[in-house]
Amino acid sequence: MTNKQKSYIECGNKAINIAQNTDCLNNKIQELSLLTKSIENQELLVPVIGGFSSGKSSLINNFLGSKVLEISVAPQTAIATELRYSQDEKIEAIKDDDSIEIFDINDLKKVEEKAQAYNHIKLYLKNQKLKEIEPIVLVDMPGFNAPIDTHNKAILRYMPSGVYFIALLSGADEKTITKTYITELNGIYARGKEFQLCISKTNMLPQSDIEQIKSYAKKTLEMEFGYSKDIELLDDNSGAKLEKILKDIDIESLFESIYKPHISMNLKEMESTINTTISALRYDKQDAINAIEVKSSLLLMCYLM
């Protein structure tokens, strides 16, 4: 659990304890209790995106140190795959109605052959690399040119819930950032989320071509998004680079961006409710004093966040 998680959970629990004897705050206490539980269980989904055959699965396999993910031979077989650490290795295939089918870890190819039947799958692996990046959960995404239904399922699920995106541009196949690629990145940028662009398959290109592709991509991203990060160059053995990208993600800042606005809003709504109550209790001195004490404590918490 990160420091920010601990801090926000502690803040939420303190606010609940302070307000628990104030009847007018019962609804807000329930909301804050749910929010605190959400913070405790929050994962950081990091999708790896790009066109079909841009090297997403190969990159993740190299990071894991073994061939876990099948390399799709056609876009139709692609499905969003979450990779999670667990002592109990298994596959969970989740349908559109949230029902779950459980498979043996060795049945991944069979599950992917029925990709159209599922919304996404969760792959639980006893892999130390996945344990080391927790609470980050890597997601191997369908390519941009996957069937519309598969692509839309992935976008609907992971565009809102993904907190950081790793975007692969195949130097060998795509060579340039297309309008379609820009549209995909704009969906991330418009939500105020960050991405890291990587040019993959550079081992298949001469150095002069790599520099040209990188230069054009950098200019395009600067113009479209004000992108200032360096562009990573990936070959067929770049698992260590992916590991560095993941470990360089500022997860404390991510938790702050996700939850600080919600915690602050909840405390301010409590304050507003208390103000209304104080006005209504202006002739009941003791109740008003109690409400003021609660308000003072909540205001102090807002200030300290």
Model-derived features: where do they sit?
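Globular "head" domains of long coiled-coil molecular machines
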Residues: 7-10, 33, 37-261
